[in-house]
Amino acid sequence: MKNSGYCLSLICLFISLCLYGCKDNAEESITEIFEIATEDLIQNFSKDAANVSISITTNLNVDNWEAKVTDKWLRATQFKNSLKISVDANIGSNRRTANVKVSSATKHYTITVTQYSASDIVIEEDIQVKPYAGKASEEETDPDRSIEHSFDNKFIADGGVPYHSKWGQSADFPVILEYYFEGNTDIDYFIYHTNSGNGTFGKFDVYTQTKENTEYVHQGSYDFNMRNSPSIASLKTPVKATKVKFEVHSGKNGYVSCDEMQFFKKNKKNTLEEQLLTVFTDITCSEIKPDVTQEQIEALPEFFIQTASALKDDSYNKWEKEFRIREYCPYSSADEWADKLMTRKYGDLDNPTGIYVNEGDEVVVLVGNTHGQSISIQNIGEETSKGYAQTSVNGDIYPLKEGVNKLTAKQTGMLFVMYNTNIQNPDAQPIKIHIPLGGGKVCGFFSLKEHQTNEKYKELIDKADYKYFCVIGNAIILYFHHKQLKAAVPYDILSSIELWDNMIQWQQELMGIEDVYPKQMNNHIFAISPEGGYMWASEGRIGFVYTVLGDILRKSYLMASRNSWGPAHEIGHVHQGAINWASTTESSNNLFSNYTIYKFGQNCSRGTELAVPEYAANVKKATLVFRRCVENKAWCDFGTDYQGEDPEMHARMNWQLWNYYHRCGYNPQFFPTLFKLMRENRVSTQDPGENQMMYARMACRAANENLTDFFERWGF
């Protein structure tokens, strides 16, 4: 017994020693980790107040390391695995530098923070050559819209009025606009500023006269594609013109208009660009020459030192660099193709920069080879004309030329590059643009083509700090409230984009534009999230109130109980033009709505029953049989609104035709053929009777059979 007790004591002692030894070994095996990446040790800021978060790899508590700043305009805030560095606005005229000293028991780092001052660059502007008089072959006189308004330097945005051909009638093409000059200064190029509506230029020719040659000489043929943005075009050769003649052959909606026509001589003295090219490989300043010295960099204007230094020491933030230095692809003219395809205008904001500005911000835009194409930048802000905030359909537009451009923002907004042209033109090549550090603030965007994954979407939307965030699909652009978008789709954006792209592409199938989209026309439909209203469609955009984003973006909801009807209905408004006439505005587009819910494969079609069987006593609305066979009413009297429209009933006519020819397989090309025929055989008036009869005739031709009985049954 004594031996047993003795043995037990020895065993306990042995176990205690083992445990104690294990504890010592465990404590000794813990290695302190405290690492800051080398690329984070240099931080550059522009003049504005800002902050950046630096990742720290560590297993230490916040209390076990510290960060101290060396100047009062600089602050450092410690977190578990990161360090936030903040700077005040630099209101001085000089660059300033300070340090953040970070220390732990094992590692010490010095983070060098440089903040640059306000832009000090001076742009050598080209020389404007002003006409002293002008003459037009036709112009509106009541009210006065004479050609003088196109060279008075008073833009519409500033309270001016444009030149406009006669109202209420198609222009007598070609419309001739002549501008008269002293003839003492070369003219190299001109900028055509549009009237944001009717009359934007399509095709035209330009001719010039000189003191030596009083006969007009052809300078070139141009096509501005009726796009609603300033367009720049060069003359074939510089000329000291006494007259410049525009022979306009086409304009939007059959009119001709011009806000301002400006003529310029290029400034041959451009010391800034010459200086930049001693350091950078090209004028976009996106890469420095390999043998550049710090002395050469320091000789640049202060504004460009920041960019050159960031490129030289590889401290240009990768996220910022992705959106500040980009190649922008060409897009078609949404105005031109709306006319050709008989649709409402698609969006033309296809090229977001991911950079926003505040009112008063100065932004430098560096433009590379334009390949002779016309580009500009547009600042899209908000409008409140309806009593609530929503994204504007257009904003201040700044024409861009190759080289250094500088603009001052008149409002807070997102910058979009406007590069709209004939995309089949061999010269329609990507254009490289750099918006350097210190100009605007990066918010970013998500592009399905570029970023591709849900993980990348989450990373980008988490970094964004602007009110709106842009998601680019193949056919749709969602420009929605950042906060509500993130709440509705925190991660799985790919399924949302797929649904919206599909809705648009299915509708395009019915329209028969497979030979057009995207080879000739490649614009997106542009969706916004107003803070009032509900769902609607207009020229250039469709709207969904920001409180329903969860309903229209989540796949599980959109696929259930015909919830895709609303989005498909609004997209249908964009596409319905060829089969629409007065009294069908809210019903002809429902061909697309019904087709969408059919393609989703979840639900039956929607609309009033054609007849009421005995067991359907719960049907409250009048049916086709009741309207035609009991009341003997015509199509235009089916409804009770001011146009006689009954959307639920009228929508059934197109859907009957689709079911018979497409679903039953009698002619699966019926609707694509019908849309093409309607585009080829347009009615020149808005008269609903003429349009209705044209629809019936073209439907017979598309079906290759007589549908008279069918349309008579529908009250034609």
Residue spans for each PLM region:
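Beta-strand-enriched, solvent-exposed domains that form extended recognition/catalytic surfaces
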Residues: Q275-G444
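Surface-exposed binding patches on compact interaction domains or structured appendages
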Residues: S55-K84
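Solvent-exposed, low-complexity, repeat-rich "mucin-like" stalks and linkers
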Residues: E27, A37-E66, V365, Q692
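Catalytic cores of extracellular degradative/oxidative enzymes
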Residues: Y457-N659, P668-F671
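Aromatic, loop-rich ligand-recognition surfaces of beta-strand-rich domains
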Residues: D158-N213, S229-E274
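Pan-zinc metallopeptidase signature
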Residues: L272-Y328, A334, M653-F716
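Bacterial Sec-dependent N-terminal signal peptides
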Residues: L13-I42, A105-V129, K268-E274
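A short beta-strand micro-motif common to beta-rich folds, especially ectodomain repeats
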Residues: N94-A105
